[in-house]
Structures are given as C-alpha cells and as structure tokens.
C-alpha cells in the first residue's frame, strides 16, 4: 500500500548547502573542511546531505555525535572519514572501531579503553584528543595535553590522528578577546608538543563562529556546523552570503469565521476582539513546532504574515487570517521559508523562544517528510 505523505514537509535545498560551504572553503584556505552532520544533519537529513557533500567534494570530513549516527553513514556507503565528537563510550567502542569511525579521547581512562578494544579487535583505532581550553565540557586542560599525547603515542592499537578544542563564545563580538586568548593557549600547547614530537596530522578548533570571525592560525582543519545550513551562529549578524537550506511547508485544512468573544484552543488563551476568520493547519508540537510559539509565532499564507493564535496542539495549530481573508482550504502555509516577498527563518522562531536556530531545525521531527532539491 502506498504511504501517504505527511501533513507538512521540509524541503532541503542542497545547492544552498553548497553555497554555504563555498563560503567556508574560502575562509578555510588550504585547510580541510569538516562538516557536522550530527542530529540528522541538524534536521536536514544526514545520509542525503552527506552523499551530496561527498559527491561534490564540498567537505573532506564529517562529524557525528553518536556511533549510531556514524554507522548509518557508513552503511549508506559514505566513505569520507567520520569523527565522533563526543567522548568514546565503552559500550559502543567496538562498533566504532570496526566501522572505522574516529574516536574522541578525553582522558587517560578513555585512552586505555580504546587501546584495549583496538588490540582485542586487531584493528588500529584512530583518535582525536580533546582539549578543554575554556568550554568546560570535555577534555583535559591544555597543560595536560603533552602527557596524554605521549601516552597515546605509546599505546598499542592507537593512532593519534588529531587534536582539537572547542570555542564557547566565538560567535559574538564581546567574546573576541576571550576567544583569542583561548586559541593562543591551545596553539601554544600544541606547538610545544610538536617541536619534539612532530606535527599532529590534524589540528582543529574553528567552529562556525570562528570560521566566520576569527584568525584560524596554524590549524589544518575547520569544523563547519550551522554555517553550512545557512545560519550565522550570531543571529544578529548580517550575512547575505549565507542561505538557509531548509523550508517547512504545510497547508490549510479548515477555515471558519468566529465572532467577538469566541475563544480558540486549549485553555481558551486567545479571544477574538473582532469578527475574523481562523485557519487550522495540521502541524503541532509532535512535528517539532514548539508549544512556546502559542500566541507568539507567525506563518505565511498567500504572501502575508499571519499570527498563530491559541495554544499549539500536538498535531494542529490555528491562525488568525483577519476578517477579509480569502484564504481557502488547501492553501500553502510556510512555517520556515519564503512565500512571495515575505520570509520567515529559523532565527525568527528562535528569537521568539529565546533559543537558537540549531534547536529549531533539529527539533523538526521524523514525522515531517523531507525532500531534497538542487542536486
């Protein structure tokens, strides 16, 4: 039996991703480009995006957060090297090593566990050592890097392929001085080791914010995340050279007229102040539309911006069309994207919710069909 399409769908413009990664390539110079495709490529579809990026050589590496994410890519035939950015876990270490996924080593215990697993499997595990230069999340401090690197060089079954850190405030102007000091501290630690050890094959620290706004120094790879999907990590930056790749589209399923005093939705949180028309749209928080946008968010219908009214339900929400609307059942509804001369972005949603564009696109659920264009 043919599968019915979902009530809403996301359209991913792969040519936009290509254009965004061209911006990254230009900033990276001769450095390698790692493209983060974790969280299903930030909601854009990891397998399809990775295939496209590999086919056209828009990136040299891919990054994931879990071994399962990496395995999905390997099983789909992706051959680009894949780095698991989060710490190597004992329970999926064997699967990672067998699949050729590069592992992140954060301390001596992790190193020992990777070494034992690699020796037992008879496979060399390639690792990247994480340094905590200010993020406070994973890795040892820069002053411990030399000792951990020496231990890794001695460990059986392990090949040190890279060393990296992560910059927590590279995306805003007020973080420039801290980021500069952080980069200097990390690179000094790396340089001291390389003077007697020899160079690390890969040294990387630049996330999207650093790629767009900082000196990349003597690094050999950059890590593009949200920038590849068309958003600056600083939502207040004016980046005309970035193109959001994802649009989210639905349609009107019902239109009715309400009178003054009529209420809409659970909790009766919205009351009509005039006779107006209300449209129902078959998208809800189960699809990834945050309930926090109730009585806050907006959509595009027939080229005009209309407010979401009442509480967003699990599977539906309502829109105030105004008293003179000629919107009908079946009309296109744009949640993210462009319609005629109007555009709504993930940044617009994020600002209303006090969050970031990353969370908006990652939250769009599997219930929403994806379609890829621009190949």
From Swiss-Prot:
The active site is at 38 (proton acceptor), 266 (proton acceptor). It is an enzyme of class 5 (isomerase). InterPro entries: Ala_racemase, Ala_racemase/Decarboxylase_C, Ala_racemase_C, Ala_racemase_N, Ala_racemase_pyridoxalP-BS, PLP-binding_barrel. Keywords: Isomerase, Pyridoxal phosphate. GO terms for cellular component: cytosol. The modification N6-(pyridoxal phosphate)lysine is found at residue 38. One of its GO terms (biological process) is D-alanine biosynthetic process. Transmembrane segments: none annotated. Its cofactor is pyridoxal 5'-phosphate. Pathway: Amino-acid biosynthesis; D-alanine biosynthesis; D-alanine from L-alanine: step 1/1. It comes from the Bacteria. Its EC number is 5.1.1.1. Substrate binds at residues 137, 314. Gene3D superfamilies: Alanine racemase (3.20.20.10), Lyase, Ornithine Decarboxylase, Chain A, domain 1 (2.40.37.10). GO terms for molecular function: alanine racemase activity; pyridoxal phosphate binding. The keyword Transmembrane helix does not apply. Catalyzes the interconversion of L-alanine and D-alanine. May also act on other amino acids. NCBIfam families: alr. Belongs to the alanine racemase family. This is Alanine racemase. It comes from Cutibacterium acnes (strain DSM 16379 / KPA171202).
């Amino acid at each position: 039996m043919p599968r019915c399409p979902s009530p809403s769908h996301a359209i991913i413009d792969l040519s936009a991703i290509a254009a965004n990664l061209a911006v990254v390539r230009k900033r990276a110079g001769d450095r390698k480009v790692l493209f983060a495709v974790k969280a299903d490529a930030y909601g854009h579809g990891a397998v399809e995006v990775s295939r496209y990026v590999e086919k056209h050589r828009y990136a040299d590496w891919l990054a994931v957060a879990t071994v399962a994410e990496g395995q999905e890519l390997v099983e789909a035939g992706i051959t680009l090297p894949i780095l698991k950015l989060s710490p190597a876990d004992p329970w999926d270490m064997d699967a990672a090593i067998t699949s050729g996924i590069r592992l992140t080593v954060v301390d001596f215990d992790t190193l020992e566990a990777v070494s034992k697993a690699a020796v037992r499997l008879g496979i060399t595990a390639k690792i990247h050592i994480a340094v905590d230069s200010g993020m406070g999340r994973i890795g040892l401090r820069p002053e411990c890097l030399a000792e951990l690197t020496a231990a890794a060089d001695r460990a059986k079954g392990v090949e040190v392929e890279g060393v990296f850190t992560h910059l927590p405030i590279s995306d805003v102007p007020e973080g420039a001085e801290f980021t500069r000091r952080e980069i200097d501290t990390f690179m000094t630690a790396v340089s001291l080791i390389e003077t007697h050890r020899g160079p690390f094959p890969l040294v990387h620290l630049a996330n999207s914010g650093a790629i767009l706004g900082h000196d990349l120094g003597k690094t050999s790879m950059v890590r593009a995340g949200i920038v590849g999907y068309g958003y600056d990590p600083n939502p207040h930056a004016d980046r005309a050279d970035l193109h959001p790749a994802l649009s989210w589209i639905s349609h009107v399923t019902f239109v009715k007229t309400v009178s003054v005093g009529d209420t809409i939705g659970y909790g009766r949180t919205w009351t009509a102040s005039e006779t107006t028309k209300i449209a129902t749209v078959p998208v809800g928080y189960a699809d990834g539309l945050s309930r926090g946008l109730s009585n806050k968010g907006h959509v595009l219908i027939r080229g005009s911006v209309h407010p979401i009214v009442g509480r967003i339900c699990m599977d539906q929400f309502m829109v105030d069309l105004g008293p003179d609307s000629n919107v009908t059942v079946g009309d296109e509804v744009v949640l993210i994207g462009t319609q005629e001369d109007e555009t709504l972005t993930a940044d617009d949603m994020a600002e209303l919710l006090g969050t970031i564009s990353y969370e908006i696109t990652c939250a769009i659920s599997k219930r929403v069909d994806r379609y890829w264009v621009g190949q």
